[in-house]
Regions:
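Membrane-interfacial segments at transmembrane helix termini in multi-pass membrane proteins
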Residues: 205-256, 368-392
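Bateman (tandem CBS) regulatory domains
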Residues: 239-252, 262, 305-318
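Short hydrophobic beta-strand motif reused across regulatory alpha/beta modules
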Residues: 287-295, 352-361
Length: 402
């Protein structure tokens, strides 16, 4: 769900402003408004007014930068969900990745290209004759900030534009998008640590809290690069797994000719704390799944002479998936149908196992060597939902859109 203040629409793209944006605008206005040289030039009120104007022009430049990314993405048929301005600049929320490294490069370079164009434009405006001195100052500052915005964003590390360009280059060279993301994310983490180090050195050298600004930006880059890396690792791990890798044989095969009374007496009363899965079989063939819900639909007076075969649901009529299918197909099916469990079938349509969300998380953790306790797995099974930080349904959607 999108957060922040919706302030309008540009080219059918919703524009949002985060609460942190107001803080940075006020801070920039204060710094410019309290500058003695400005106060001397245009007075206190004029200094504050021009400071506010500079802040608006700065974020207008950021908005145009993000709009550059967005319009190129739209030209490739990619939906742009929103553009948001916040403390550290702006971000365009794009529905999916570009299909090719060349298209990914085009989306990435568009933002810095807009910033360079704005730098040239404001530089030329500043050379016009007859402009007031304060106008020349503001125009010059906006020109410089656009140049800085372009150059900073070209640093080759995610989530910066340069990281996206680096990712596209590695993707092109290796024919692997995940390899490109991995390299660019690692580069972004290096950049993030560099920013943090620079900020701390600046702070201790100057004693000014403004020296910490590079550290805050570095922390932002580090966290986002880490998020890219984690998401890439999860996607890569998921695409290597088959449904059979997650299926478990936690079910019982019963004689299809067993009476419903015998079934109820021998199995339903033995363990009320678990929810076992039952399949009916006869003559070496599976006849279907037997559920408590179907048993309850039968009058108790009929239990003596009705058999499991009479209430068994054929395997191809219950939620099922082939063991040869990618695990991502099972994840998508569970989410789309809001199912608790799937029956996994062999190519001959026999039962290979069952799987639920807990089994999927266990298989993924094993694939990626992630430590996860059985208690967490059982909690996922009971709740029928993935943990908050591991929304595999959304991750699979991202894989399929890539």
């Amino acid at each position: 769900m999108q957060t922040g203040w919706r302030v309008g629409t540009l080219f059918n793209i919703p524009l949002f402003i985060d609460n942190s944006w107001f803080f940075i605008v006020l801070l920039i206005t204060f710094l410019r408004g309290s500058d003695p040289s400005r106060i001397e030039l245009v007075g206190p009120a004029g200094a504050w007014a021009t400071g506010f104007l500079y802040a608006l022009l700065l974020f207008s430049s950021v908005l145009l930068h993000e709009l550059g990314h967005s319009l190129v993405a739209k030209a490739q048929g990619i939906k742009v969900n929103s553009i948001k301005l916040f403390l550290f600049g702006g971000i365009a929320s794009i529905e999916r990745e570009s299909k090719t490294p060349g298209e990914a490069f085009q989306v990435a370079i568009a933002g810095p290209a807009v910033s360079i164009a704005l730098f040239v434009l404001f530089t030329l405006l500043g050379r016009l004759d007859g402009l007031p001195q304060i106008a020349n100052i503001i125009i010059g500052e906006v020109a410089i900030v656009n140049l800085i915005l372009a150059l900073f964003n070209l640093i080759p590390g995610l989530p910066l534009d340069g990281g996206q360009i680096f990712k596209a280059a590695v993707w092109k060279a290796t024919k692997s998008r995940t390899t490109g993301v991995r390299w660019a994310a690692k580069a972004g983490q290096f950049v993030g640590w560099g920013g943090i180090s620079l900020g701390l050195i600046s702070f201790f050298a100057s004693g000014s809290f403004f020296g910490l600004w590079p550290a805050l930006i570095g922390l932002f880059i580090l966290r986002n690069a880490g998020a890219y890396n984690r998401m890439n690792t999860l996607q890569e791990g998921l695409t290597k797994l088959k449904t059979s890798d997650a299926a478990i044989r936690d079910f019982r095969v019963l004689d299809a000719n067993m009476s419903l009374r015998q079934f109820a007496d021998e199995y339903l009363l033995e363990d009320k704390t678990s929810s076992p899965v039952y399949f009916a079989s006869s003559d070496g063939r599976y006849r279907g799944m037997v559920t408590i819900e179907d048993l309850r639909q039968v009058e108790r007076s009929e239990w003596e002479h009705r058999t499991l075969h009479s209430i068994a649901r054929p395997l191809l009529e219950i939620p099922h998936i082939s063991e040869t299918k990618p695990l991502t197909d099972a994840i998508r099916l569970l989410e789309e149908k809001q199912l608790a469990r799937l029956t996994v079938l062999t190519p001959a349509d026999a039962v290979a196992g069952t799987l639920d969300r807990g089994d999927i998380v266990r298989a993924l953790a094993k694939q990626l060597n992630f430590p996860i306790t059985e208690a967490i797995i059982q909690k996922i099974k009971q709740e029928g939902a993935y943990p908050a930080g591991l929304q595999l349904g959304a991750i699979v959607q991202a894989i399929e859109k890539a």
